[in-house]
Amino acid sequence: MPYTVVIMGISYNLESHKMKTSDISAFARVLAIEAGDLMLSEREGAQLSYSFKKGTELVTSADLAVDQLISAKIKQKFPEHVILSEESSPDIGRVEDLSSPLWIIDPIDGTVNYAHGHNQSAVSIAYADDGDIEVGVVLNPFTNELFSAIKGKGALLNGQSIKVA
């Protein structure tokens, strides 16, 4: 069922079938913003619990909560899409068909910084179709910096075009 979202004054019509990359980007930006809000509230409002995956990689309860939020929204909107997430499904070997739509997620990129109260962490979401990365979104909710890019169309910071340095 179609629905419309408005981001920075631009309306995007979101459909559950094959979508334009601009609509995928809009959806990913909405996800990143919601995930960023959860990152902030998890760190401000509760005691973070910690564990280690593979014995050495720090993972927090916030990593898992943000991962669950993003994954659930993608599955709800696109049940046929594959999700590759650092926290819940980190093994690329589990992705059998790279030609199908694929979401690549790092729910909290910079977990160590996040866990130690530093603001250098972000939500990272990418979308690939037919083996090619088409859309990338990175949000640092602490600095309100939302980076987004669409293959062949350049990159934006908070909706403004940016150039490679």
Predicted regions and their residues:
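N-terminal subdomain of lithium-sensitive/metallo-dependent phosphomonoesterases centered on the IMPase/IPPase/PAP
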Residues: 3-108
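Charged/polar positions on well-ordered alpha helices
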Residues: 30, 34-38, 112, 138, ...
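Conserved G/P- and acidic residue-centered "switch" motifs that form tight phosphate/ATP-binding loops
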Residues: 63, 111, 140
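Conserved protein kinase catalytic core
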Residues: 92-93, 112-115, 146
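Short loop/turn motifs at secondary-structure junctions and domain boundaries
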Residues: 94-98, 117-118, 139
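Glycine-rich active-site/cofactor-binding loop and its immediate structural neighborhood
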Residues: 101-131, 135
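Acidic beta-strand-loop-alpha-helix segment within the catalytic core
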Residues: 125-165
